Design a protein with these regions (language model features):
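Basic/polar N-terminal segments that are highly enriched at the extreme N-terminus
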Residues: 1-4
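Acetyl-CoA-dependent GNAT
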Residues: 6, 10-16, 21-81, 87, ...
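Residue-level recognition of the GNAT/N-acetyltransferase active site
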Residues: 74, 92, 125
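Conserved acetyl-CoA-binding loop-helix of GNAT-fold acetyltransferases
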Residues: 91, 97-110, 133, 137
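Conserved active-site alpha-helix within GNAT-family acetyltransferase domains
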Residues: 102, 126-145
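Conserved GNAT acetyl-CoA-binding A-motif
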Residues: 105, 113-123
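Conserved beta-strand-loop-alpha-helix junction that forms the acyl-donor binding cleft
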Residues: 121-131, 150-153
Length: 153
């Protein structure tokens, strides 16, 4: 578990290499294959260069980046404004249960609210009960009768 002070900030170009290593850990945790570090580095660079498509917040302590959150804002007529979406949230295994995830979500919520978002959502794996409990503590609730659907483009 991390013991030094965590600082939350938006990712910068100088964070890309270290961030890609943490994203690799996420892919291993979720058993996603194959991991293409160069493609992920290019995507992170794109997000950093164009915050209008999304933002990446990082949690850093003296040991390095301990977690990240990727989010974006999209127009949503149902909610009557912008909808904030959390695309990814990952905290390094040895930094979990230390408040890192909560700090990342809080920072993203503040920034997205400042951008005009009126609601926030994310998908959580049905089997990931621990994550569901975490989000519930932060005030999130399952939307009854709805499920996330996907299609590759």
């Amino acid at each position: 578990m991390t013991t030094s002070t965590i600082h939350i900030a938006t990712a910068k170009s100088s964070d890309i290499a270290e961030l890609v290593q943490l994203i690799r850990q996420y892919w291993e945790y979720e058993q996603l294959k194959p991991f293409d570090g160069d493609a992920i580095a290019n995507l992170v660079a794109e997000v950093i260069a164009h915050p209008e498509i999304g933002q990446c917040w990082i949690a850093r302590d003296d040991a390095g980046i301990q977690g990240y959150l990727v989010g974006s804002c999209v127009p949503n007529f149902e909610y009557g404004g912008l909808l904030a979406l959390i695309a990814d949230l990952y905290v390094a295994s040895d930094a979990r249960r230390s408040g890192v995830g909560q700090q990342l979500v809080h920072a993203a919520e503040l920034a997205m609210r400042a951008r005009g978002c009126v609601h926030i959502a994310m998908e959580v794996a049905a089997k990931n009960v621990r994550a569901q409990q975490f989000y519930s503590i932060l005030g999130f609730a399952t939307r009854a009768g709805y499920s996330m659907m996907h299609k590759a483009l």
